[in-house]
């Protein structure tokens, strides 16, 4: 199991990303807009750099919601592969069955 501090750090990052999502999207749109003047685009770029580093969604890491494991996490379920397997075999995930052909 991952340290609780790592799990809490990821939760904090998720909150920051949600908080600054609109502002970041607006600034990125200005930077990408070719009809704006170079000065406006430059100002938007500077404002983007002023946002907190952890407000960038690329800094987020998908973690298992049970164990906090950072690797082998299925996005659809939010679980690591081993926990997904355990829960699936117990039949606790509706519609999920082991493949057989």
UniProtKB/Swiss-Prot annotation:
Keywords: Ribonucleoprotein, Ribosomal protein, RNA-binding, rRNA-binding
GO terms for cellular component: cytoplasm; small ribosomal subunit
Pfam family, one: Ribosomal_S14
SUPFAM superfamilies reported for this sequence: Glucocorticoid receptor-like (DNA-binding domain)
InterPro entries, A to Z: Ribosomal_uS14, Ribosomal_uS14_bac/plastid
Keyword Cytoplasm among record annotations: no
One MF annotation (Gene Ontology) recorded for this entry: rRNA binding
Stored Gene3D superfamilies: 1.10.287.1480
One GO term of the biological process aspect: translation
Subunit structure: Part of the 30S ribosomal subunit. Contacts proteins S3 and S10.
Family: Belongs to the universal ribosomal protein uS14 family.
Function: Binds 16S rRNA, required for the assembly of 30S particles and may also be responsible for determining the conformation of the 16S rRNA at the A site.
Protein name (database record): Small ribosomal subunit protein uS14
Originating species: Ralstonia nicotianae (strain ATCC BAA-1114 / GMI1000) (Ralstonia solanacearum)
Lineage: Bacteria, Pseudomonadati, Pseudomonadota, Betaproteobacteria, Burkholderiales
């Amino acid at each position: 199991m991952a340290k609780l501090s790592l799990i809490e750090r990821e939760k904090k990052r998720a909150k920051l990303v949600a908080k600054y999502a609109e502002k970041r999207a607006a600034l990125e749109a200005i930077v990408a807009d070719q009809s704006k003047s170079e000065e406006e685009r430059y100002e938007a770029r500077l404002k983007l750099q002023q946002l907190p580093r952890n407000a960038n969604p690329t800094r987020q890491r998908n973690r298992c919601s049970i164990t906090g494991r950072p690797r082998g996490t299925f996005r659809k379920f939010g679980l690591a592969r081993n926990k997904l397997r355990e829960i699936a075999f117990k039949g606790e995930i509706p519609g999920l069955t082991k493949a057989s052909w």
